[in-house]
């Protein structure tokens, strides 16, 4: 067995150890450390494998790109894990250990999706991740909103899986193979205008659109974000979407879909609709979680533009480096910023409404400053990491002469600026009621880390960009 499987094996061992701990003697502190140890060792092993040669078998492919995405995933998980112990002690009375177990199972599924190269391995790891998230979302079983969110996510997951299974079956009927690469070769070498083949592809895409909550498959996404426990919402918006988007990227990057105008038109329409509708719906919200839910729709709409670049001209497949760089930079920038946002919200004791943030600048200035920087980064304001992500996106579009989405991107960004600034204005409002207790040294350190990371990489992006370029190249 190849060493490339080591991170997944380490997480699997952590899952087994945690199961024994839960069965023999419950201990929240021990479960916390077992989870963290598993994630940290898996991340270190994944980093050590970045320089290893490309490895592929029938079900999985390990490349430098998948390695970096796996490190990004594990890094997000570790950062969120650091906040978990305190949050669970405050908000969950019983069965805290199961949260860590479900987190590790979801992590294992997400890692498998990132390296999947076959529809069989993709679907099994997708279901492992999705079923784990059902438990995580409905974890606060004493709260009706959490139970409702869990049922809604279960229904959406079932619908997405049904679409994907139907699409996979149709594609297999046409090609006789379930490999991603074979699908790409089939698109390149045969006539992809067959309506049955195209129908299969569209079914698969619809399933992935549900997983990414893109328009028009964004039903209940805000309800799920608001009803789930806050750490689950953080995991759902980062880990789940990263894994799902990587699969979508693979399908478009492996083959030239230029001849299949139906699929390309679908992606273009979904991208524009997600950019505009996501931000317009966010304008109407009074909950910070609902705002982040709808803004995530628009951000992944922006990312769809980069998928479109891979197939706008056939020559792109001979030199795909810059679109790939832009995609990896924007995806990393958005997920890092969003992880920072949820990390800050987990430290605050208020509710999920914007009112809970009123006067935060006067009671907890460091929390407010870090959350403001996160909002400015999500809005794409200069000197932040989010701005550099949008700069890469626009530069790639102009370089490859795909400029038609840019007016929609500008309009959507202007709309988004209003609700991001609204959050900052609420925090600047005067209030007479103080927020929670004094900050611990750990909280202060993590808040400064978020500020320095977003501002540092936004002001001096060369190191981050060069790292991405070396990986993609």
Swiss-Prot record:
GO MF, one term, reads: quinone binding
Annotated coiled-coil segments of the chain: none
Report the main location listed first in the record: membrane
Q: What is its EC number?
A: 7.1.1.-
What sections of the protein cross the membrane? 3-23, 30-50, 62-82, 99-119, 120-140, 153-173, 195-215, 230-252, 262-282, 291-311, 326-346, 368-388, 408-428, 444-464
Using the record, list the residue span of the signal peptide; answer none if the entry has no such feature: none
Q: What class of enzyme is it?
A: translocase
Quote the subcellular location field of this record: Cell inner membrane
Query: Which protein family is named in the record?
Result: Belongs to the complex I subunit 2 family.
> How is the quaternary structure described?
NDH-1 is composed of 13 different subunits. Subunits NuoA, H, J, K, L, M, N constitute the membrane sector of the complex.
What is the recorded name of this protein? NADH-quinone oxidoreductase subunit N
Q: Which gene encodes it?
A: nuoN
């Amino acid at each position: 067995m190849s060493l490339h499987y080591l991170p997944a094996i380490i997480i699997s061992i952590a899952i087994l150890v945690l199961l024994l701990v839960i069965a023999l003697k419950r201990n929240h502190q021990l479960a916390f450390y077992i989870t963290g140890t598993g994630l940290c060792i898996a991340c270190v092993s994944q980093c050590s494998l970045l320089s290893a040669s490309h490895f592929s078998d029938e079900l999985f492919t390990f490349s430098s790109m998948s390695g970096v995405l796996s490190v990004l995933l594990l890094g997000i998980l570790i950062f969120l894990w650091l906040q978990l112990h305190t949050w669970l002690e405050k908000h969950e009375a019983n069965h805290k250990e199961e949260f860590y177990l479900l987190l590790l199972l979801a992590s294992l599924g997400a890692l498998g999706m990132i390296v999947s190269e076959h529809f069989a391995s993709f679907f099994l790891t997708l279901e492992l991740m999705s079923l784990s998230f059902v438990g995580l979302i409905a974890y606060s079983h004493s709260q009706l909103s959490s139970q409702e969110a869990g049922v809604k996510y279960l229904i959406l997951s079932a619908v997405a899986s049904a679409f994907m299974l139907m699409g996979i079956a149709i594609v297999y009927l046409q090609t006789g193979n379930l490999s991603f690469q074979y699908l790409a070769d089939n698109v390149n070498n045969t006539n992809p205008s067959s309506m049955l083949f195209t129908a299969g592809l569209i079914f698969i895409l619809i399933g992935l659109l549900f997983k990414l909550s893109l328009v028009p498959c964004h039903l209940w996404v805000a309800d799920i974000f608001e009803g789930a426990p806050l750490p689950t919402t953080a995991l759902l918006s980062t880990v789940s979407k990263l894994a799902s988007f990587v699969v979508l990227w693979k399908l478009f990057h492996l083959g030239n879909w230029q001849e299949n105008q139906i699929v390309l038109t679908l992606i273009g329409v979904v991208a524009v609709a997600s950019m505009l509708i996501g931000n317009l719906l966010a304008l109407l919200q009074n909950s910070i979680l609902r705002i982040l839910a709808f803004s995530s729709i628009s951000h992944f709409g922006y990312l769809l533009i980069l998928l479109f670049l891979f197939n706008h001209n056939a020559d792109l497949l001979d030199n795909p480096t810059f679109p790939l760089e832009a995609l990896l930079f924007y995806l990393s920038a958005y997920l890092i910023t969003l992880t920072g946002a949820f990390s800050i919200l987990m430290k605050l004791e208020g509710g999920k409404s914007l009112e809970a943030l009123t006067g935060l600048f006067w009671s907890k200035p460091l929390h407010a400053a870090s959350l403001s920087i996160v909002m400015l980064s999500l809005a794409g304001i200069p000197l932040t990491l989010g701005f550099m992500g949008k700069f890469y996106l626009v530069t790639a579009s102009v370089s490859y002469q795909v400029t038609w989405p840019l007016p929609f991107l500008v309009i959507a960004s202007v709309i988004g600026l209003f609700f991001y600034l609204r959050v900052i204005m609420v925090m600047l409002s005067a209030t007479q009621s103080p927020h929670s207790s004094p900050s611990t040294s750990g909280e202060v350190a993590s808040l400064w880390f978020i500020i320095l990371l977003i501002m540092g990489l936004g002001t001096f992006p060369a190191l981050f960009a060069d790292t991405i370029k070396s990986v993609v190249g």
